[in-house]
């Protein structure tokens, strides 16, 4: 499950203070008396310097304010913090993977009564009930929001998550359960849940309704893209109608692990010209060379088409999920860029600067 991380940076004010040199008015060394002519020359010199400075300021170009390409106007962050979280109610909690899937993933809906004004692409924090081994409250865990800003019920009063239950065996052979993921997956309707946020601006949707949006997800990294796609294809707005191309690549281990497939099938039937989806099922599929079908393997089948899209200034790439996917995708892009004499590392920096390459991996 991808999550937006936040870091607070503290800077010492003292480090920014520079000791000022004493002005001539405060100099106590004896100075020879100045003549009237010298005084006038001093005034003239100061006047010339002032005029030159003013001209330089006037000639300096005004700093251009950066205008974001994303829906960032009025975005709210950190309305609720760990010390004073919002307490919502679990309304729905459903397992969305088959019984034979390697691991459980749950879709859950919490009431917010409109008090958490999030946008598509943001995250919320959840604080599990109870205390840790030191007797302190559990730390929050961040989860990407899986619903549009209107919520699954369409009334802007709920928020949804897509959570995989974390269970693993450590080096000592002990079974370890992730505190927050198990707390969430075990929630019953009517239970309280402590929520913080919303947080994050990296994964906000583009403003342009004609944009090409390429979404790359593994597992529960699908969450923010479900929020995008609901807004694009399941909802109606007076000021937004998606007319571009939304292309989703989703990587999972087995077909029983595919998340929200029925929803995506409906979207594809509704808008075949605007929505494409390709799955990579690593334990069941292989490419022509017999290699396991990971997300980057599936993308390689369309690499020329993807590269041509990526060269357009209205194409945006969003990546969410396991960190390991990033290198495989970079490897594809390196060879494609090289054919055009482009250094991929430099080009990716330009894309990031232009908000066209957006990554949230863990």
Swiss-Prot record:
EC number of this enzyme: 1.18.1.2
Interval spanned by the transit peptide: 1-62
Residues engaged in binding NADP(+): 144, 164, 220, 252-253, 282-283, 292, 321-322, 360
Keywords: Chloroplast, Disulfide bond, Electron transport, FAD, Flavoprotein, Membrane, NADP, Oxidoreductase, Phosphoprotein, Photosynthesis, Plastid, Thylakoid, Transit peptide, Transport
Gene Ontology BP, a term: photosynthesis
A single Gene Ontology CC term: chloroplast thylakoid membrane protein complex
Family: Belongs to the ferredoxin--NADP reductase type 1 family.
UniProt protein name: Ferredoxin--NADP reductase, leaf isozyme 1, chloroplastic
Natural source organism: Oryza sativa subsp. japonica (Rice)
Gene transcribed to yield this protein: LFNR1
């Amino acid at each position: 499950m991808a999550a937006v991380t936040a870091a607070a940076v503290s800077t010492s004010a003292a480090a920014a203070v520079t000791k000022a040199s004493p002005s001539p008015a405060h100099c106590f060394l004896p100075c020879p008396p100045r003549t009237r002519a010298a005084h006038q020359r001093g005034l003239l010199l100061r006047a010339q310097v002032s005029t030159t400075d003013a001209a330089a300021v006037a000639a300096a170009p005004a700093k251009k304010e950066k205008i974001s390409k994303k829906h960032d106007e009025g975005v709210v962050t950190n309305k609720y913090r760990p010390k004073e979280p919002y307490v919502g109610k679990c309304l729905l909690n459903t397992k969305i993977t088959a019984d034979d899937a390697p691991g459980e993933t749950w879709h859950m809906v919490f009431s917010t009564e409109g008090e958490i004004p999030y946008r598509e692409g943001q995250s919320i924090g959840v604080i599990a009930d109870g205390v840790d081994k030191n007797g302190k409250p559990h730390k929050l865990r961040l989860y990407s929001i899986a619903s549009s800003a209107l919520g699954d019920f369409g009334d802007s009063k709920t928020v949804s998550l897509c959570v995989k239950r974390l269970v693993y065996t450590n080096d000592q052979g002990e079974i370890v359960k992730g505190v927050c993921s198990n707390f969430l997956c075990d929630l019953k309707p009517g239970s309280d849940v402590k929520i913080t946020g919303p947080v994050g601006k990296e994964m906000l949707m583009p403003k342009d309704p004609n944009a090409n949006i390429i979404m790359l997800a593994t597992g529960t990294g699908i969450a923010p893209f479900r929020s995008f796609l609901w807004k694009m294809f399941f909802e109606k707005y007076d000021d937004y109608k998606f007319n571009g191309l939304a292309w989703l690549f989703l990587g999972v281990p087995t077909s029983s692990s595919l998340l929200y497939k029925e929803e995506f099938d409906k979207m594809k039937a509704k808008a075949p010209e605007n929505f494409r989806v390709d799955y990579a099922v690593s334990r069941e599929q292989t490419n022509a060379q017999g290699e396991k079908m990971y997300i980057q393997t599936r993308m390689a089948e369309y690499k020329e088409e993807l590269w041509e899209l990526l060269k357009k200034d209205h194409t945006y790439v969003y990546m969410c999920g396991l960190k390991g996917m990033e290198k495989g995708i970079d490897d594809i892009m390196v060879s494609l860029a090289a054919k055009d004499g482009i250094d991929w590392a430099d080009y990716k920096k330009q894309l990031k600067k232009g908000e066209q390459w957006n990554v949230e991996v863990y």
